[in-house]
Amino acid sequence: MLDLTELEKSLGVKFENLSLLEQALIHTSWVNENPNHLSGSNERMEFLGDAVLGVIFADRLYHDFPDIQEGDLTRFRSLLVRRESLVRVALGINLGKYLYLGRGEDASKGRFKPANLAGAFEAVLAAIYLDKGIDATREVIFRLFKTEMERVQTLSSNIDYKSRLQELVQAQFQLTPRYRIIDFSGPEHNHLFIAEVYTEDKVLAEGSGRSKKEAETSAAKEALQQFENSFTAEDNI
């Protein structure tokens, strides 16, 4: 059995049942060369880990972004659980070093193959879940995926507002909101743009940003806020 002490430290988890972590590291190629190994490969644990990862991120996104619709929540979750994200995290904890691989797979750089790393990482999450429960697994995921979660936070501030405003305005008034830059200031390399969103001859709101897109997004967000405030006021009458 490999010494998994350093891997436990990287994960921030001390296993009660270390055989779960070992099982998560066993690739099918190793099982094929060791037929007497009774517990099989990590594929079943990979299945469980994938589900655990998905539900933890779905829960986090649902509570962090109450105003964002299902389509964008799904896109955010896909960004978090995609193979590239899993591989980055797996490389960060040097997971490939600990994989049980068959000789041929090892010789063909199997310790660095994205599919092997992503699958093993999902299996490791399953091992943590089975050994420590959902709360401990959640803590590990949020710590290891900090970079990906920060990216989603940034994306959430720049998307959705324009499409949501368009849906609202079209539903309420059968009009399509448009955007225009009405002013800018500051040096050429660091302009501050002012945008307004309007329908026909009615200005709905203004917004500002360091790019035209950011200014338009800000205007859409402000317009949405005004609509929401007006709806709330009507409800209270």
Swiss-Prot record:
GO terms for molecular function: double-stranded RNA binding; metal ion binding; ribonuclease III activity; rRNA binding. It catalyses: Endonucleolytic cleavage to 5'-phosphomonoester. The active site is at residues 50, 122. Residues 160-229 form the DRBM domain. Its cofactor is Mg(2+). InterPro entries: dsRBD_dom, RNase_III, RNase_III_dom, RNase_III_sf. It is found in: Cytoplasm. It is an enzyme of class 3 (hydrolase). It holds the Pfam family Ribonucleas_3_3. Its EC number is 3.1.26.3. The keyword Isomerase does not apply. Mg(2+) binds at residues 46, 122. Its main location: cytoplasm. Keywords: Cytoplasm, Endonuclease, Hydrolase, Magnesium, Metal-binding, mRNA processing, Nuclease, RNA-binding, rRNA processing, rRNA-binding, tRNA processing. Residues 4-133 form the RNase III domain. One of its GO terms (cellular component) is cytoplasm. GO terms for biological process: mRNA processing; regulation of gene expression; rRNA processing; tRNA processing. CDD domains: DSRM_RNAse_III_family, RIBOc. Digests double-stranded RNA. Involved in the processing of primary rRNA transcript to yield the immediate precursors to the large and small rRNAs (23S and 16S). Processes some mRNAs, and tRNAs when they are encoded in the rRNA operon. Processes pre-crRNA and tracrRNA of type II CRISPR loci if present in the organism. Belongs to the ribonuclease III family. PANTHER family: RIBONUCLEASE 3, RIBONUCLEASE III. Homodimer. HAMAP family: RNase_III. This is Ribonuclease 3.
